[in-house]
Amino acid sequence: MAGHSKWANIQHRKGRQDEKRGKIWTRIIREIVVAARAGGGDTAMNPRLRLAIDKAKAANMPADRIKYNVDKATGNQEGVSYEEIRYEGYGIGGAAIIIDTMTDNRVRTVAEVRHAFSKYGGNLGTDGSVSFQFKHCGQFMFAPGSSEDRIMEVALDAGAEDVVTDDDGTVEVLCAPPDFEAVQAALQAAGLVPELAEVTMRAENTVALDGEDAQRMQKLLDVLEDLDDTQAVFHNAELDE
């Protein structure tokens, strides 16, 4: 296992999010608009919208702004139409990268993604070129030192598929995407608060990178995450500190 722990990865991500809070709001608004447009504005009937609104609340987005964007998506306000597009490619050392985007201009988006790969040492691939290396799942991450036994008891009873303790002590709960809300509710009811809770693409295997290669890979990932149309970036690199 490379020296860059999962806990360090989480802290890096949270630090990046704190630096660009405005961009986080923009991404969440896109998620709300797309979810509401696809499944309607009733959160009781639209789990994707529920999750997007939960993200908005966690990011301290005002309730009136959330409501405005739900209304915009469901026809009560005029708005932009977004398209969801996934790009796949290779980073340093052949590490796999997935970029999920929402865009109102796919020509602009693919040009920006391709430019980022080309400039920072990667290659944009074709549909399906790397996604088979990932599993779509719900993921909850608890800090090193958390009670693994208690987390395991609550999570498995709620329908989680697995609970894993990583080398650095991080406790990771995995579940099928449809079970995400049930597992999350059970953990919250038990007073177990994860540092990270999301439906994600989890790498099945990793590529270890260190030194200059790790730095170059981190730069590529940061540039891809900073693109205006990017919603999420997933990868299978283990970056050595």
Swiss-Prot record:
MF (Gene Ontology): DNA binding
Subcellular location as annotated: Cytoplasm
GO terms classed as biological process: regulation of DNA-templated transcription
Main location: cytoplasm
Pfam families: TACO1_YebC_N, Transcrip_reg
UniProt KW Magnesium keyword: no
Region (Disordered): 1-20
The keyword ATP-binding is assigned to this record: no
SUPFAM superfamilies the record matches: YebC-like (SSF75625)
The entry's keywords: Cytoplasm, DNA-binding, Transcription, Transcription regulation
UniProt cross-references to InterPro entries, sorted A to Z: Integrase-like_N, TACO1_YebC-like_2nd/3rd_dom, TACO1_YebC_N, Transcrip_reg_TACO1-like, Transcrip_reg_TACO1-like_dom3, YebC-like
A single cellular component GO annotation: cytosol
Family classification: Belongs to the TACO1 family.
NCBIfam families: PRK00110.1, PRK12378.1, YebC/PmpR family DNA-binding transcriptional regulator
Name of the protein: Probable transcriptional regulatory protein Mpe_A1337
Record organism: Methylibium petroleiphilum (strain ATCC BAA-1232 / LMG 22953 / PM1)
